[in-house]
């Protein structure tokens, strides 16, 4: 009878080692791609104020004299139907987008859609759900995409008062976080 080349434990150790090496290579390639776009000036790292964004079915309380905001802050918005949109019109390499929006009622789903070059319509195939990283902070991880537009759906129920200050595109974060799964 022939002995197996590697025992089960050795094979498992080899598989884990190979996975770790592939993870590091993947992260280094991602760093290289990001650095390339950043050096070419094609990776926006900016905060976009609410006034600079286009909204649909998502209006500031100040736009209607009959609406009463929850407090005196001028950044309160109200979704006027169950499918409000916030649009960023621009292009660039986007890894992460962060929505600053504190909701007074449960928002349902908060999602981001992105357009790739040549597209005109947003599709479910290019949809990213938010991860709540702090109260009122929704982070979308696009995994590094060249986009020609973003659409954020800040809630999916309608009638939700939202303290909305804008979005951050590719916010700064420590380099080593790329290696954390």
Model regions and ranges:
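N-terminal Sec-pathway targeting helices
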Residues: 2-21
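Glycan-recognition and processing domains
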Residues: 20-91, 168-181
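Polyanion-binding and phosphate-handling cores
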Residues: 81-83, 148-151, 163-165
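Solvent-exposed strand-loop boundary residues in beta-sheet-rich modules
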Residues: 116-120, 158, 173
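Short beta-strand-plus-loop segments that form exposed binding edges in beta-rich domains
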Residues: 151-159
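Edge beta-strands of jelly-roll/beta-sandwich modules across compartments, strongly enriched
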Residues: 158-172
């Amino acid at each position: 009878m022939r002995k197996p080349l590697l025992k089960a434990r050795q094979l498992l150790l080899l598989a884990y080692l190979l996975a770790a090496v592939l993870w590091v290579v993947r992260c280094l390639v991602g760093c290289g791609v990001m650095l390339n776009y950043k050096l070419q000036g094609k990776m926006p790292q900016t905060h976009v104020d609410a006034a600079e964004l286009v909204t649909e079915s998502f209006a500031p309380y100040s736009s209607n004299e009959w609406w009463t905001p929850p407090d005196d802050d001028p950044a309160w918005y109200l979704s006027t139907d169950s499918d409000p949109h916030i649009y960023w019109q621009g292009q660039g390499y986007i890894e992460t987008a962060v929505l600053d929006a504190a909701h007074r009622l449960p928002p349902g789903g908060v999602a981001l859609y992105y357009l790739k070059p040549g597209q005109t319509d947003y599709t479910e195939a290019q949809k990213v759900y938010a991860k709540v990283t702090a109260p009122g902070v929704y982070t979308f991880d696009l995994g590094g995409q060249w986009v020609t537009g973003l659409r954020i759906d800040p809630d999916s129920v309608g009638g939700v008062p939202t303290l909305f200050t804008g979005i951050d595109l590719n916010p700064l974060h420590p380099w080593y976080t790329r290696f954390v799964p």
